[in-house]
Amino acid sequence: MVLQNLKFHHIGIAVSDFEKIASYYYSIGYKKFNKSIIRDELQVVDLILLIHDFHPNIELVKPLNERSPINNYLKSSDVAIYHFCYEVDSFSDVIKEL
């Protein structure tokens, strides 16, 4: 079964303010994986991947402007769980099994 071999990679968290949220994660031992912010024009977001020696990786996802679909997650709060990401050997095999 393909689904039994899923490997957890990170939690995606939608945020309205990188500095405010990232400072909390830095205070509990998280570090930036990349030196710079990653821009994703397709999703209309900026991304920061945070890593920790013992805790799950976290991807902070911030909308670039009002057209970003991420804004829907931030209507009632400045922070919201956006997604869970898993590593797979074959995306098409996972889709078939679902």
Predicted regions mapped to residue ranges:
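Short amphipathic alpha-helical segments
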Residues: K7-I11, A80-Y82
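Core segments of cupin and vicinal oxygen chelate
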Residues: L3-L6, I13-N57, D93-L98
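Mid-chain, well-packed structural core segment of small domains
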Residues: P69, Y73-L98
